[in-house]
Amino acid sequence: LAISRMTSQAHAKGLENEKRRIFSTAIWLFFGLGLVCSVLMFFRADALARFLNNSLAATAVQALAPAVFCVCLLACMRGYTQGQGNMTPTAVSQVLEALLKLGIGLPLAWYVLHIGKTAELSAAGAIVGVTAGTAVSMLFLCAYLVTHRNRKESLDVPSSSGQIIKQILLIGVPITLSNSAMSIINIIDTKIVMGRLQNGLGLSETAAAVLNGQYRI
């Protein structure tokens, strides 16, 4: 949303260099943030799963980790195209993402169970569909932006990268925090429920995970 708003303002004023600077600064910022978060999530999956009192989820967390990187870049590219009033790339990328999530995740989850693997590996297989969907969606937008590169000449002097990053944070952080509220509540809820099922009722981790899954349904 922050990228879309900033790009829209520059687009309305005809500031082509400003638009390019916003995108180039944002893409590198989100590239770094996404890469760090994905690496931490992948290699610290066990710690995150233990925090949720569900060590069985570690494999699924690792399967989801690359998607974090892809989503960061997707947000930047979608914001850039939307800010120019072009919703088609976003719409196509979202359709691709949804189709692959279902088309890869569901068959893979079924296949893993069919060959006799554990439920947690089947869950990880389903999550692979999410990662594949976001990755293909990201590649589609990359190809679109390369083939539709902004080559318009302009004499405007763009803002510095530092100013753009500051503006992204000022706009984006409050929005991100408000949108993350429900996700944070769900994480805390999962931790509490799994902990009470195991420590309060004395259930095994597997039994607690099954009951927690039924509770979520």
Predicted regions and their residues:
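Hydrophobic alpha-helical transmembrane segments
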Residues: S93-P107, G116-T147
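Helix-terminus/linker motif at the lipid-water interface of multi-pass membrane proteins
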Residues: A49-R50, K117, T176, S180-I217
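Interhelical loop/hinge segments that connect adjacent transmembrane helices in multipass membrane
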Residues: A119-I127, C142-N179
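Membrane-interface junctions at transmembrane-helix termini in multi-pass inner-membrane proteins
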Residues: C72-S93
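Small-residue-rich midsections of specific transmembrane alpha-helices
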Residues: L1-S8, V68-C70, R216-I217
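Transmembrane-helix boundary and interhelical linker motifs in polytopic inner-membrane proteins
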Residues: L1-W28, G83-T88
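Alpha-helical transmembrane segments of multi-pass membrane proteins
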Residues: N54-M77
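Short membrane-interface helical motifs at transmembrane helix boundaries
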Residues: V36-L56, H114
